């Protein structure tokens, strides 16, 4: 039987990036609202592979801060920041797929990294941190969807043990490129 209450997961880790810089991975907090929102908007401007467009965001910095604090205090999900020299370089998190008993074992995961920090290992580190947190919270499976053209992300997920379980050829309808195929992936924890 799946527990009705999960563990609240706190995360803090310092890693060394491929270029030698230090990066802190940690739970977002209310004070991070402005920086996290700026990163969210920036990363969503930099690629067409994410779920939303920057102009669809309706959160203020204060609301983003409250969202981050709620996640930090939640037993259903986590929102992590990757911070380099006080700058938010990336965000990643997971949430329960749903609250019903039959799906309570599943978590839905996503991440984004500022393009200037790509290929330094931040995305990989955030992914593994979320896997670790999801496992610690009591989830048994973590899931994601990724645009099929995003081959580097798919390779990263496969290397971590995610397996494809389906595709939706019209999963996204991009303003720029039309329909984008989504690949659905999962990893047992």
Question: Positions of the model-derived regions?
Answer:
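Terminal substrate-recognition subdomain of acyl/acetyltransferases
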Residues: 2-19, 168, 175-189
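A short beta-loop-alpha structural element at the N-terminal edge
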Residues: 23-36
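Helix-loop element at the rim of GNAT/NAT acetyltransferase active sites that forms part
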Residues: 38-55
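Acetyl-CoA-dependent GNAT
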Residues: 57-105, 110-116, 128, 188
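Short glycine/proline-centered loop/turn elements that form peptide/ligand docking sites
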Residues: 123, 127, 149-153, 170-176
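Conserved GNAT acetyl-CoA-binding A-motif
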Residues: 127, 134-145
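Conserved catalytic-core motifs of GNAT/GCN5-like acyltransferases
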Residues: 143-146, 158, 163-180
